[in-house]
Structures are given as C-alpha cells and as structure tokens.
C-alpha cells in the first residue's frame, strides 16, 4: 500500500507540475497508458478552465492509475462518457462509483442498450451490464444521460456530437458503441469505442458519416476486428489513437510478430495505405495532445 501511495503521489506531482490549466484557448487530451498490458480504453480531457471529461476509463486494472490522474487534476469530473458496456471500457468507472474517495462525478453519458440486447451475451458480461445499469438507476449523486445520434452539447468550450447509438438490430455489444465527436476551433477527435464492421457500415450509410471527419480518430476495437477497410478509407482523419496493448498491436501472443489470430497488422497496413504516419499507442506510454 505504501508503494502504491508513493507511485500515485509521483503521478500527481508530475501532472500538477507539467499539465495544470493555463490561459490557453484549447483543451488538453491525455491517452492513458496501459497499466498491465491489457485491453482497455481510457482518455481524460481538461478544458481551458479546468473542467474534466473522461472517455470510458478502462478495465479494473486501470482503476488506481485513473483515480490518481483524476485526483491530481482536481477530482471533479464534469462528464463521463461510456461508449458501450464491456468491462474493459467501464469497470474502472464501476470501481470509482463504488468507492469514490475524493472523486465527484456530475454527469454520465451513454447509449443504454435494450434488455433484449443485454441477454445476447451470457455470463460475466451480462451480469456486469446489469450491475452498471442498477447503479445508474439508483444514484442521486450524478445525472445519467441517454444519448442519441444528432445530440449536441457543449462543455466549457468543448463541443460534442453523438454520431451513433445502440443498435438493437445488430449482434454483439461492440456494435452498440456510442460514437462521439469532440472538437473546438483548434482540433477534433472522434471516438469509435469498439464499433464493429456492421455498426461501422450503418454509420457509413447514415447522415452522420460526414461528421467523422476529424484530426484524431480512435481506432475501433483496439485497432483490430472493428470497423472495416471501407470505413477507414472513407473516413477523413490525419492521426490515429490506438487504445491497444503490445500483444494486440503486434498480433503476438508469445510466438512472435503477427503469429496470433488478430487482424491488427492488416488494419495497420490500411492506415499506411491511407498515408497516415501519426499514431499514438497506449502501450508506449502517456500521450498528451494540446
């Protein structure tokens, strides 16, 4: 416990010394690094006036790092977005809701999947979603917003637009991912969550595909077996955010580069083919984009 406290204190000192809000005209985004080289999805945004926004938050193993990061930036989260209810995206939030300590959350934004969709995945995933929604339904401490495509709102100069919501006609929780665009006058991001090929095609055929145009695109499903090649080729973006552990990025389960059963190397080739060379990968460490 003493070692963990010292580590978190060091993280807090680093953030406060180098990342405190200044009189600048754009927000800051951090892509948080993998803590145990596992899949996860965790982004923290700070507005020019110090308001905090979290995208997903990551798996259970990410909890204490995320908690320390948020606390060092003031501990009050104005908005927490959940792309879809898989534990590698929301379990850190669950842990913080159960034991907030100094953290205060004001608003949670998500696209609630139907009871029928919940039952399409069995076992642990099914129970975790029910636990999450029970917490949402029974807490007066924060507001929960159920979002839909076309919803737009602004938080301290940062704009948001929902491009995709839960898709009950499609299989798999991944295809229920809420796609979020975030921007100001300086830069723009689109977060795809774990959107699958089917969900990507539905978005591509919708009126909101034009809004996918952005500077930074979060690669779907950790960069493999998410949106298909046609989606990435049609989307307009200049840089990639990879919430991806090393073994996924290299498709290496222990037998060497590209020896696993994942599609990451194929997706990486698509990105090269598109001419994009700016890639930010979570296993390589903390990324700060100003």
Predicted regions and their residues:
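Second-shell loop/turn segments in exported
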Residues: 31, 55-59, 79-83, 110, ...
């Amino acid at each position: 416990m003493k070692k963990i406290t010292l580590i978190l204190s060091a993280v807090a000192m680093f953030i406060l010394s180098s990342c405190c809000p200044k009189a600048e005209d754009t927000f800051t985004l951090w892509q948080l690094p993998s803590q145990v080289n596992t899949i996860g999805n965790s982004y923290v945004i700070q507005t020019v006036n110090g308001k905090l926004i979290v995208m997903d938050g990551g798996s259970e193993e990410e909890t204490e790092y995320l908690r320390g990061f948020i606390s060092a930036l003031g501990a009050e989260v104005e908005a927490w977005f959940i792309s879809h209810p898989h534990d590698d995206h929301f379990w850190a939030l669950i842990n913080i809701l159960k034991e907030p300590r100094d953290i205060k959350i004001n608003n949670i934004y998500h696209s609630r999947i139907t009871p029928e969709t919940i039952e399409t995945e069995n076992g642990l995933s099914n129970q975790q979603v029910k636990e999450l929604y029970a917490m949402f339904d029974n807490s007066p401490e924060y507001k929960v917003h159920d979002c839909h495509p076309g919803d737009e709102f602004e938080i301290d100069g940062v704009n948001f637009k929902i491009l995709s919501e839960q898709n009950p006609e499609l299989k798999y929780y991944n295809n229920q991912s809420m796609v979020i665009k975030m921007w100001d006058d300086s830069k723009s991001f689109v977060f795809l969550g774990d959107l699958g090929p089917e969900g990507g095609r539905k978005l591509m055929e919708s009126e909101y595909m034009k809004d996918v145009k952005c500077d930074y695109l979060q690669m779907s499903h950790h960069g493999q077996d998410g949106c298909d090649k046609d989606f990435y080729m049609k989307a307009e973006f200049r840089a990639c955010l990879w919430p991806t552990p090393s073994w996924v990025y290299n498709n290496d389960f222990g037998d060497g580069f590209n020896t696993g059963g994942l599609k990451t190397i194929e997706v990486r080739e698509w990105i090269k083919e598109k001419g994009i060379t700016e890639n930010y990968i979570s296993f390589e460490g903390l990324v700060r984009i100003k």
